[in-house]
Amino acid sequence: MSKRPVALIILDGFALREETYGNAVAQANKPNFDRYWNEYPHATLKACGEAVGLPEGQMGNSEVGHLNIGAGRIVYQSLTRVNIAIREGEFDRNETFLAAMNHVKQHGTSLHLFGLLSDGGVHSHIHHLYALLRLAAKEGVKRVYIHGFLDGRDVGPQTAPQYIKELQEKIKEYGVGEIATLSGRYYSMDRDKRWERVEKAYRAMVYGEGPTYRDPLECIEDSYKNGIYDEFVLPSVIVREDGSPVATIQDNDAIIFYNFRPDRAIQISNTFTNEDFREFDRGPKHPKNLFFVCLTHFSETVKGYVAFKPTNLDNTIGEVLSQHGLRQLRIAETEKYPHVTFFMSGGREEKFPGEDRILINSPKVATYDLKPEMSAYEVTEALLKEIAADKYDAIILNYANPDMVGHSGMLEPTIKAVEAVDECLGKVVDAILEKGGIAIITADHGNADEVLTPEGKPQTAHTTNPVPVIVTKHGIELRKDGILGDLAPTMLDLLGLPQPKEMTGKTLIVK
């Protein structure tokens, strides 16, 4: 029996904007996309900011886009989850934070807050530190010490003074907190097993060892004089008038590590939490009975308490298709294969029953502007065979070109990339229509729509422009206010399947 597949076709990095200058999507000759756009119900979707679980105004990316598409709901990223918790008052009721504060009140000990001291939003956000200071003041914790990791990478290389001054203002405002140590992230946030770096940060915090300064700003000035900028500032100790450290981490203290991204938080956390730690000698004063809090789940190896536990994504599109006994195919070239598999399945590696995957190798070139078609033709050829074989009820396909070539910031190759994808799109959609199937043509975020700045310089980053959605079915109407999280419910609707309660997105088809 002939299958009538519903195919979700993701044109990676393909968004829409009216301005045609520097816009490879608008300038490309794409007769197939234009034909489907004119002939079938279409709309645009928001693919950035809070619509995909990021802070407002922040551009989307492929990982976040595919997570939202597959989950059929807004998947809040860690930064946004914490921001919302602060905004709605949940942060102050967080049981893990309150337990850490009760621990130090019961033992008459100190609370240490450490993390990256910037608003870069990649590993941490300084506003989360301020929220912790405010909470400590509210909870009556008297001894609160800050161990600031200096950034200079996700923000400018000499921005530490502005963050330190801002922090000092907040300390005055809340009446709690003192800066105890400062360390460039090169030391305290190493992830490459350079344990000699981590040891320097550890010994500053626990033993008060390292260069000493009366004033945190003096530490930065001194480093700058020696040509050492924020990221590389040596772990340094702030001292009182008598030369003793403002604070060291001791037995029965509590630590709240307010970074939310795990990769650069794991080593320093292991140093404090692992009883069988062997990477360097922690010495006789290694603190015992520490109450160690990670803002998010860092790793199974970190023996600490987690303030914001991971959210499990149940009933993603793949799981629902599988539960209903449908056959599904995921297909992409190497660059976007993890996105149509792992991210589309909510961070799950294993296939669901009835799920097949086809990986087509991306071309071995230094940069994709040298081969703008990438492996789109090979992906298409493989998929056409599968459509002809009548095996699948649902297909999820990604074309990587507009994004990967768009990252070059070169207009001509990106136009060629869009044109190659359009040629392939025509073949795939026509094959699906011949089988009586339906295609949902969309994208995960923008990129190729803006590859030059207004001044004509390369613009290599993603954009915040809306992405298209076309459903190749006559006689329906699409909502105009959709988000990526509405695509899975739409797919289920077209397949005649019920939408699980976990999917809080809504079908784009107007009822």
From Swiss-Prot:
Q: Which residues carry this modification: Phosphotyrosine?
A: Y36
Binding residues for Mn(2+) 1? D403, H407, H462
Q: State the disulfide connectivity.
A: none
Gene Ontology cellular component terms for the protein in this record: cytosol
UniProtKB keywords = Glycolysis, Isomerase, Manganese, Metal-binding, Phosphoprotein
Q: What broad class of enzyme is this?
A: isomerase
Its family remark reads: Belongs to the BPG-independent phosphoglycerate mutase family.
How this chain assembles, per its entry, is: Monomer.
Protein name from the UniProt record:
2,3-bisphosphoglycerate-independent phosphoglycerate mutase
The organism's lineage is: Bacteria, Bacillati, Bacillota, Bacilli, Bacillales
Q: Give the gene symbol.
A: gpmI
